[in-house]
């Protein structure tokens, strides 16, 4: 079960990008990877053609494994730090909750 979703703010907990944070752009549950804005940047040499308007060296985000990411706690004394996620039933719906502060994670998302 994926605990990280598109639009979440996450922090990298291991690897060369440790302690960098960003917003999740895309999640691929089958491959257990995610694209995070501003994290794990790579450079690609790209030729101009019909599909690519820009040519030269392009810097873009590469996928990063979900096991290296942790959600950022939105509220409480641990605001901005990594937290685990638990699920609670609220009005017969599953709600994601930060373990450290107990605050809901899906409040303003659609």
Swiss-Prot record:
Pfam families: KOW, ribosomal_L24. Transmembrane segments: none annotated. The keyword Ribonucleoprotein applies. One of its GO terms (molecular function) is structural constituent of ribosome. SMART domains: KOW. It comes from the Bacteria. Keywords: Ribonucleoprotein, Ribosomal protein, RNA-binding, rRNA-binding. InterPro entries: KOW, Rib_uL2_dom2, Ribosomal_uL24, Ribosomal_uL24_CS, Ribosomal_uL24_KOW, Translation_prot_SH3-like_sf. GO terms for biological process: translation. The keyword Ribonucleoprotein applies. One of its GO terms (cellular component) is ribosome. PANTHER family: MITOCHONDRIAL RIBOSOMAL PROTEIN L24. NCBIfam families: rplX_bact. Belongs to the universal ribosomal protein uL24 family. One of two assembly initiator proteins, it binds directly to the 5'-end of the 23S rRNA, where it nucleates assembly of the 50S subunit. One of the proteins that surrounds the polypeptide exit tunnel on the outside of the subunit. HAMAP family: Ribosomal_uL24_B (MF_01326_B). Part of the 50S ribosomal subunit. This is Large ribosomal subunit protein uL24. It comes from Ureaplasma parvum serovar 3 (strain ATCC 700970). The lineage of its organism: Bacteria, Bacillati, Mycoplasmatota, Mycoplasmoidales, Mycoplasmoidaceae. The gene is rplX.
